[in-house]
Each structure stands twice: as structure tokens, then as C-alpha cells.
A protein has these predicted regions:
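S-adenosylmethionine/decaboxylated-SAM
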Residues: 2-176
Length: 176
């Protein structure tokens, strides 16, 4: 509510990094009614021990067929909004997306790969494409998990490096 009232208008452009099954994306649409919502997720089942307990780890909770089905589900969930050009879906990593992106965003929600290096790059890239007085929100701040505290470490790294204002609460973080 605070973000909607003070930062995000109905003509806003919103980016979500890490869409998974689209549940939070749906909430973004319902609560903010943006002009455009861009969803970015590679929908890849990752290899390696580090990903074993993640939502997208091949040896844990997922495999590539499941990820492919999630991608199809998200496209079906937003079929109407895609036709209306209100939602656009990119099946690629956030790095790949940012390399070709020309848009600026009012709000960027980061919920992609939670390992430090990925979150750090997502924040770096997001800051380049954030509109003046825009907001960045990160998922799982100060929460522990398979990601070895990567979200919190990336935020602390940027807090030292950038002139940013950090607001914490409900495990979300705001940059502007």
C-alpha cells in the first residue's frame, strides 16, 4: 500500500525478475494495475549440489519438464493480458534480458536466483534501468535458505558502494 500510494502510478512500468509460477505476478497486476508488467525467468532446472533444495534445482524439487510446464502455466495465466500488451514474458536469464533491454522501470521486483553473485548483478542492472524515484524490492531479505544468505550479502555490498536509501520490513527492501 505504501509503495502504491507514494511511488507507483497506473502508468507505471514494472519488471519482475524470477516469475516461477506467476502467483506474485498476478498480485502485482491486481494491486498496482501497471501500464506494463514484464516478467523475466529462464524456467531452467539448474544442476549442482547448491541448487538441490531450491525451487529450480534439477536434483531437488524440479526437473526441466516441470520448469517447461511452469512457463506454459504462466503464459496461460496471463493470456488475456499478453493479448492486451499489458504483460510481456521473457524466457531468459535476467542478465540476458538486461543486455537487450531499453526500458526504464518504476518498480523492479527481484526474486530470481538468490545466490550472492546473481543478486548483486540483478541489483547492479536494476539500478541502471530504474526511473528517478523508482523502487527496487528484493525477496527473502534477511531470510536464511539454500542460497547461503546471498540476498542479504548483496544488499550489504551495495549499501557500502552506492548512495541508496534502504527501507526494510516484511522481508522486502526498497532502493531509490
Amino acid at each position: 500500500k505504501l509503495i502504491k500510494e507514494h511511488f507507483i502510478g497506473e502508468n507505471s512500468q514494472i519488471l519482475e525478475i524470477g516469475t516461477h509460477r506467476g502467483n506474485f505476478s498476478k498480485q502485482i497486476l491486481e494491486n498496482f494495475n501497471p501500464k506494463k508488467l514484464i516478467l523475466v525467468d529462464p524456467w531452467i532446472a539448474f544442476e549442482g549440489k547448491i541448487y538441490k533444495n531450491s525451487w529450480y534445482g534439477r536434483s531437488g524439487h524440479s526437473n526441466q519438464e516441470i520448469q517447461n510446464n511452469y512457463y506454459i502455466e504462466v503464459n496461460q495465466l496471463f493470456e488475456k493480458e499478453i493479448i492486451e500488451n499489458k504483460v510481456e514474458i521473457f524466457r531468459k536469464t535476467s542478465d540476458e534480458f538486461f543486455n537487450k533491454n531499453l526500458n526504464k522501470f518504476d518498480l523492479i521486483y527481484i526474486d530470481g536466483n538468490h545466490l550472492f553473485e546473481f543478486v548483486r548483478r540483478d541489483i547492479d542492472n536494476s539500478l541502471k534501468f530504474l526511473k528517478k524515484n523508482g523502487v527496487i524490492i528484493l525477496d527473502d531479505y534477511k531470510l536464511k535458505g539454500w542460497w547461503d544468505d546471498g540476498v542479504t550479502k548483496a544488499i550489504k555490498f551495495h549499501e557500502k558502494e552506492k548512495n541508496i536509501k534502504i527501507i526494510t520490513g516484511h522481508n522486502l527492501l526498497n532502493y531509490h
